[in-house]
Amino acid sequence: MSMQKTNKTPLTLALIVAIGITGAASAAVHLSDDGQGQVLIYPYYTTRAGQDTYLSVLNSTALSKALRVRFNEGKNGREVLSLSVYLAPYDIWTAAVVNTADGAKLMTADKSCTAPALPVDGKSFVNFAYWGAAIEGIQKSGGDGATTSLDRTREGYFEIIEMGTITNTAINAAITHASGVPANCAVVQATTMDMGPASTLVMGGQSARAFKATGGLSGTASLVNVAGGTDFGYAPVVLEAFSPSLAENIWDYPGSIFPDLTFADLTSSVLYKGNVVSSTWNKGSDAISALLMHDSIINEYVLDDTTLSGTDWVITMPTKRYNVPVHDKEKGTDDDTQLLSPFTSKFWGRGSGSYNGACEQIANFWVPPDSWNREGGNYNGLGFPGDPFIGQRLCWETNVATFKDAQVLGSANAESVPVPFEHGWVRMLFNSVGIPVVNGQTDGNGVVHSQAAHSLTSVNGDTYFGLPTVGFMVQDFINQNAAPGVLATYGGNFNHKYTTRISRLPP
């Protein structure tokens, strides 16, 4: 065979040399370079504008896996549904997020074991994590000033985390398929089931504890609009060596808010200009931020009048919820909350302008994103003719930058981006500095800065510039010359390109 386990990519080899290991699975947490790993971050789900989101996760290994699947709404990253999924060797789990009269729900015809069991007619997303009176500070639940409506569940992002591998013979037999159906899902759905690192449960004469996560997970997602005839398919961002090397497993009970991205190894490895930057952190979510930090996003746009084309960019910041506190901005300086790097604004979901969400500036507030046409013509002035510029911000955890308000995805978290050309490309910069903030901005190394900036510094002094983002571009086209009665709508999507800057090496 032309592809073998012994073939190593440049990133894997660089990590092996830099960290002194014999296999990438023992390395610090890093981005996977082969599309498989322990954690999958899916930048976007939506049920808006006639779309449903179809998803899959594949276990390509000979080991059974315990997974945590978590859906987060897009405004402030609050959990709207989580469940455990148990995959037998070589198994795939598939599901869909679909629209309801009130919000969104998860449906599946897949037979793989979940805990809890999913109803035949699906499980509705809930608003428990953002319901009630506003609670100031960095919280996982409570009001945040934004709407408590279930409509908020209709778009966001989701993550799948490997909690561990299953070595218990009886549990393995229960989740393994026979004639297409697992033998006994009730085993893993029982309230007495405990596979955690402190478990004393014995089944079939063996400990029920899960063993270390080993990776080998991959996945897909598709934003499907049946009536519109479009399908925007994408692959998730994949993290490898997520679990700390000394952790036996990170399993937790169904319904728990854990594990999440804070459970990551406290050392991150990033390949930068041919060298591996290995940084140490006080919390796991900062290690994940380091992997995703970019000081600019680069991608294309198409706004062709003939084909009625439109372009949206999805931009999700999956570690924002760990660093941005809720604070009623109408209280002004009466503020006991603490903002954490690399974000520069606190969250309040009610109001207008900078009071709405936790807004991050795109480049200089008064200067639009740099834009080029297809012939290399550049425009980066103080405003586009016919498009008064008022400053672009990304205010939510999951954002949609919609070019000239094209609204391809119909997002409620959209920010319209003015551009001077019909076709071209944009470089969206994240380089804010000197942002006033009450109580300052606490950096990744514990230093409190009097003003906030788009940067994150590790315990060992590496500074990463920009914001931690994942996402992609979508564009649609309509063939107005197609035969009568023929649906002639087309769609395409493309991953963002990025620039990265780390202070350890020359910029």
Residue positions per predicted region:
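Beta-strand-rich interaction surfaces with strong enrichment in secreted/lumenal proteins
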Residues: 29, 82-85
